[in-house]
Design a protein with these regions (language model features):
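Substrate-binding pocket helix/loop in short-chain dehydrogenase/reductase
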Residues: 98-99, 106-108
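Active-site helix of classical SDR
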Residues: 122, 157
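Residue(s) in the substrate-gating loop at a strand-loop-helix junction
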Residues: 141
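C-terminal helical subdomain
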Residues: 175, 179, 196-237
Length: 238
């Protein structure tokens, strides 16, 4: 069930410059929260997530309670938006499985949230993105270019997300499309996968800065891919 908390696009008179609008998924996650906090100063942000109690809210942030996977069957129930200048796909799930361990249900659960939902949400917002000549940012991962024996499903979804971004960029030349691929980042997702020293991984705020760079690219350019890596790779640390 979606509860947009009576969300509507910010009002403005015809003589005013329209308020820029950003839509961010994964709003209750560590990375999503930082992205929202960074963009909220310049955009009206629609923060999408499943937990009403955890969603941020302010004059410049409208919380939108939505289950993106349920929306694949029920339709994406979204606020009525006139334009979307920035769409950031930050929602994802990651559980380690080998090929032997992974069941069809495991594959479907990861593909639905990590690939199918971004594709469908983008499709639903294409008219608004076209109108604003907006930017779509897909949060990928180092796993999008590599694969590991114990993390095959997550890596497969992130490889697919690259293909989605690259195809969208070709089919929608009026929309800028970027992949931002962070390495290990200090988020609840990473905490669920491994033990680590937070000082040795990427701070979520640094990923938000990379996204800021993408959305502020000049009008004649688009940054198609940014790899965000730890200052010193984990395997090189002494």
């Amino acid at each position: 069930m979606t509860d947009t908390k009576n969300a509507t696009a910010p009002a403005h008179s015809e003589s005013e410059t329209p308020q820029k609008v950003a839509v961010i998924t994964g709003a209750t996650g560590g990375m999503g929260r930082e992205i929202i906090a960074d963009l909220a100063g310049d955009y009206h942000v629609y923060a999408l997530g499943r937990s009403a109690a955890e969603l941020p809210e302010s004059d410049s942030i409208t919380p939108v309670v939505i289950d993106l996977v349920a929306g694949l069957d029920e339709g994406m129930k979204l606020p009525e938006l006139d334009r979307v200048d920035v769409l950031v796909h930050a929602a994802a799930r990651a559980t380690k499985y080998s090929v032997e361990e992974a069941t069809p249900e495991n594959w479907r659960a990861h593909m639905d949230l990590n690939v199918h939902a971004p594709a469908e949400l983008t499709r639903a917002l294409l008219p608004q993105l076209r109108k604003a000549e907006g930017t779509v940012v897909f949060i990928n991962s180092g796993a999008g270019r590599h694969s590991y024996g114990d993390n095959v499903i997550y890596a497969a979804t992130k490889h697919a997300l690259y293909a989605l971004a690259d195809g969208l960029r070709i089919s929608e030349p009026g929309i800028r499309v970027s992949t931002v691929a962070p390495g290990p980042t200090d988020t609840p997702m990473l905490k669920g996968l491994q033990d680590y020293d937070p000082s040795q991984v990427i701070a979520p705020a640094e990923v938000a800065r990379a996204i800021r760079t993408v959305v502020e690219a000049g009008p004649t350019t688009q940054l198609t891919e940014i790899q965000v890596r730890p200052r010193i790779e984990l395997h090189l640390r002494k």
